[in-house]
């Protein structure tokens, strides 16, 4: 029997980002966490729905990622669920993201949080906002693909 508990690799996904943005390029970033945050992440108490990434003073920061503290969290440390958390990226990656964000219509959003060995990683992406008609067309394409799969499944039974 192993000492370490096996946990699924993906902790949380930001499905809203995939709906609202066209993803152009993805990056893997480390994240600076406190002990109680890691415990909460192991328990699955993470929400990434409205989170976003900003570059300030040459450093990447994750905003609005809610990590809800457990009831058994330390009482001598004030737990802020919506705290701003530092992302760990190479200088080259930060410069690339900064260059694209400064262009009109581009932003940086987190897509997923996952385990890579004992560490928590955040997948962030350079993205461009979708227009309403693009979202509608994407939904129509998804619906048609689902219907097509159903028809083929019935035809080949």
From Swiss-Prot:
InterPro entries from the UniProt entry? SmpB, SsrA-bd_prot, SsrA-bd_prot_CS
Q: Which keywords appear in this protein's UniProt record, sorted alphabetically?
A: Cytoplasm, RNA-binding
One cellular component (GO) term of this entry? cytosol
* Biological process annotations from GO: trans-translation
Key word Cytoplasm present: yes
Record's subcellular location: Cytoplasm
One GO MF annotation is: RNA binding
Report residue spans for region: Disordered.
Answer: 132-157
Comp. bias intervals (Basic and acidic residues): 135-157
| Function per UniProt | Required for rescue of stalled ribosomes mediated by trans-translation. Binds to transfer-messenger RNA (tmRNA), required for stable association of tmRNA with ribosomes. tmRNA and SmpB together mimic tRNA shape, replacing the anticodon stem-loop with SmpB. tmRNA is encoded by the ssrA gene; the 2 termini fold to resemble tRNA(Ala) and it encodes a 'tag peptide', a short internal open reading frame. During trans-translation Ala-aminoacylated tmRNA acts like a tRNA, entering the A-site of stalled ribosomes, displacing the stalled mRNA.
* Family membership noted in the UniProt record: Belongs to the SmpB family.
Could you identify this protein by its name?
SsrA-binding protein
- The species is Francisella tularensis subsp. novicida (strain U112)
